[in-house]
């Protein structure tokens, strides 16, 4: 008798994706982040569901309902902080996952990569609308500032902003629709993630060398299931350390003040995971230019396959490209730091230099370096 997991229509899908999947024998821990992102998404959907049971999306009661969750609901505080810090863990895994893709040339799987970029945008949109829901000062002003950026679009900008707001300012209608978006988007993310996986399994995984590994495959289970479980345990450990010992470490103190349209906070800034893009936005004095730079900073990922000039797929055997990659990482960390600083000298200048460096490395220096490395291979 054939095993049920290989014959049953539903079990067969699971089997081919997580059990009998042929995987390269040499993929490192950098390949753990896909499964970690899946765990993050499940965790966020579950904690979010329980929060939604007690949350009210009305400007008069939203802030109080979050306070009520923390004070009166059984284990409400841990659910709330797991959800808030879970978002941070989600983005840490996302950035490392994208970084792995850049380093090892995984972007040559075009469909997988492009759906990944769409996923990144969707997760960022979800995090943004979610940040508005507690209706604190930073929620309100963050929503006002970021939605206002759309007014930079010529001709239709102002109408578009008012259409998104549902009025002439961020108000009750805005909060209600943002809650609706925040509830639906994670399910869209889950669907996109399945398509992401579908396209990945058409080609099979890349590996650190960037060399086809068809001659040397091992079954996903037990080798990579046990490896993923280790990653998941480390993820949950770090998340719970954050939640139980420093729940407000990554948050903004201003968000413990209820939203007040008459009082602007001295420094409006988004959550830490958007600071690099925020720094790029602020480093251009022109509004439309800033918005274009902001969008380009993420959209540039779609160009990665076109900018790949190397004869080798991975950076494993390309020391010059490796140097550039780590300079890019340092540059992004610099931008993240600048995004959280006030708009004054010397931060403005540092931000502008870091922003120019970001685009210069990706668009100019990396392709040139790859071409030089190709020529060095002839020696």
UniProtKB/Swiss-Prot annotation:
Question: Any extra detail in the entry?
Answer: Heme 1 (or BL or b562) is low-potential and absorbs at about 562 nm, and heme 2 (or BH or b566) is high-potential and absorbs at about 566 nm.
Q: Which coenzyme or cofactor does it need?
A: heme b
**Iron as a keyword?**
yes
Q: Which gene encodes it?
A: MT-CYB
Entry's SUPFAM superfamilies? a domain/subunit of cytochrome bc1 complex (Ubiquinol-cytochrome c reductase), Transmembrane di-heme cytochromes
Q: Which InterPro entries match?
A: Cyt_b/b6_C, Cyt_b/b6_C_sf, Cyt_b/b6_N, Cytb/b6-like_sf, Cytochrome_b, Cytochrome_b_C_euk/bac, Cytochrome_b_N_euk/bac, Di-haem_cyt_TM
Q: Name one Pfam family in it.
A: Cytochrom_B_C
Instruction: Give the protein family.
Output: Belongs to the cytochrome b family.
User: Which residues hold a ubiquinone?
Assistant: 201
- What binding details are noted for the cofactor? Binds 2 heme b groups non-covalently.
Q: Which UniProt keywords apply?
A: Electron transport, Heme, Iron, Membrane, Metal-binding, Mitochondrion, Mitochondrion inner membrane, Respiratory chain, Transmembrane, Transmembrane helix, Transport, Ubiquinone
Where does the record say this protein resides?
Mitochondrion inner membrane
Report the membrane topology from the UniProt record. Answer: Multi-pass membrane protein
Can you cite an annotated GO cellular component? mitochondrial inner membrane
Protein's name according to its UniProt entry: Cytochrome b
What GO biological process terms are annotated to this protein in UniProt? Answer: mitochondrial electron transport, ubiquinol to cytochrome c
Answer whether the UniProt record assigns the keyword Transport to this protein.
yes
What GO molecular function terms would the record report? metal ion binding; ubiquinol-cytochrome-c reductase activity
Recorded source organism is Capreolus pygargus (Eastern roe deer)
Chain positions recorded as heme b b566 binding sites: 97, 196
Q: Enumerate the transmembrane spans.
A: 33-53, 77-98, 113-133, 178-198, 226-246, 288-308, 320-340, 347-367
Q: How does it assemble?
A: The cytochrome bc1 complex contains 11 subunits: 3 respiratory subunits (MT-CYB, CYC1 and UQCRFS1), 2 core proteins (UQCRC1 and UQCRC2) and 6 low-molecular weight proteins (UQCRH/QCR6, UQCRB/QCR7, UQCRQ/QCR8, UQCR10/QCR9, UQCR11/QCR10 and a cleavage product of UQCRFS1). This cytochrome bc1 complex then forms a dimer.
Q: Which positions are annotated as binding heme b b562?
A: 83, 182
């Amino acid at each position: 008798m054939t095993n049920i997991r290989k014959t049953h229509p539903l079990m067969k899908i699971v089997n081919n994706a997580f059990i009998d999947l042929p995987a390269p024998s040499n993929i490192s821990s950098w390949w753990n982040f896909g499964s970690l992102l899946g765990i993050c998404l499940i965790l966020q959907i579950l904690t979010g569901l329980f929060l939604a049971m007690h949350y009210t999306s009305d400007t008069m009661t939203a802030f109080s309902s979050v306070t009520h969750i923390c004070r009166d609901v059984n284990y409400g505080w841990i659910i709330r902080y797991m959800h808030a810090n879970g978002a941070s863990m989600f983005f840490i895994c996302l950035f490392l996952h994208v970084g792995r893709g850049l380093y090892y040339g995984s972007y040559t799987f075009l469909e997988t990569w492009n759906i990944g970029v769409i996923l990144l945008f969707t997760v960022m949109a979800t995090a943004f609308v979610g940040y508005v829901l507690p209706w604190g000062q930073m929620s309100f002003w963050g929503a006002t500032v970021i939605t206002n950026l759309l007014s930079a679009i010529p001709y239709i900008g102002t109408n578009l902003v008012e259409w998104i707001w549902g009025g002439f300012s961020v108000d009750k209608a805005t909060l209600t629709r943002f809650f609706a978006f925040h509830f639906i988007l994670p399910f869209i993310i889950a669907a996109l993630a399945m398509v992401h996986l579908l396209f990945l399994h058409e080609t099979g995984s890349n590996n650190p060398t960037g060399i086809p590994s068809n001659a040397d495959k091992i079954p996903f289970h037990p080798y990579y299931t046990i490896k993923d479980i280790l990653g998941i345990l480390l993820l949950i450990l770090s998340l719970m350390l954050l939640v139980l010992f420093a729940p407000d470490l990554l948050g903004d103190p201003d968000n413990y003040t209820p939203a007040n349209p008459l009082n602007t906070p001295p420094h409006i800034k988004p959550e830490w995971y958007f600071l690099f893009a925020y720094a790029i936005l602020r480093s251009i004095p022109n509004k439309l230019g800033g918005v274009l730079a902001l969008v380009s900073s993420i959209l540039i990922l779609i160009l990665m396959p076109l900018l790949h000039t190397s004869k080798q797929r991975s950076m494993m055997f390309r020391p010059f490209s490796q140097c550039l990659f780590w300079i890019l990482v340092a540059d992004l960390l610099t931008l993240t730091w600048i995004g959280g600083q006030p708009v004054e000298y010397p931060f403005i200048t540092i931000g502008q230099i870091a922003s120019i460096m970001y685009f210069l490395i990706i668009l100019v220096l990396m392709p040139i370096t790859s071409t030089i490395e190709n020529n060095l291979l002839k020696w």
